[in-house]
Amino acid sequence: MFGTNEIVGQKYFKDAPKDSLFVTSMFFTLQGEGPYAGKPALFIRLTKCNLACSFCDTFFDDGDWMTFEEINSRAYHTICDYWNKQGKDVPEWILPKSNLDGLGPFDCVLVVTGGEPLLQKNLMDYLNYSKNFFTAMQIESNGTVNQDVPEHVTLVCSPKCSEKNGVAVKYLAPTELILKRADCLKFVMSSEADSPYNNVPDWAHEWKQETGKEIYVSPMNVYNTFPQKIKILHAESGSITMDQRSTVDEVISFWEPGLLNLAENQTNH
């Protein structure tokens, strides 16, 4: 979070357990940006990243190894618990429907994010394993790590900048493989005039003209400090559980006094 994470490469996962992923958190919500904005979404946040962006507001250094079967079992309960914890029945529209092959998919989008999800070599096997579990699948990647993403998965490439002393210097261009495969690009935008995040880079405009694919933008949130609830949790707990990482770590109180830089966020938005 805020550039304090450990930086790792694909070698970190070279001895990964078979048919398993290193998972930080899992939660159900509405997708707020990109090609599936407004759609119900099951988020799986994978652990570790090859970058350390100073504005990043998510934790992804801690995690648990989970088998593909364990991930989908937890996904099922996460989706159902979203409504059950509100004292409501799970709506029929999202539940799997019976068909000739058994049960169909959940009517929601699987969003795999991080960290940098493409660091984990087992991810492609999981996406193929779970192809019929969700109506749509999306990966969000910074574009600097190569993997062959299956065609049934929407690849959202969200490029980030190199930094020096916590200040953005220039965009890191996605690899040729990822840029060719990407279904869309997504950029975080800042109102700071001298920041690279103030504009969509020229190469992205050229990519859009050549491919006809979409570019999405979203505002950068600027914080004055770490969220208090997260600081307390990490200070008091010897080890953070999946449930804790999937709730407190993922739900930041925007009403916490002094947390957000309101002036900068107003101009960014």
Locations of regions flagged by a protein language model:
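Short, solvent-exposed loop/turn elements at beta->coil junctions and helix N-caps
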Residues: T29-E33
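Conserved AdoMet/S-adenosylmethionine-binding subsite of the radical SAM
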Residues: F106-C108, L118-H269
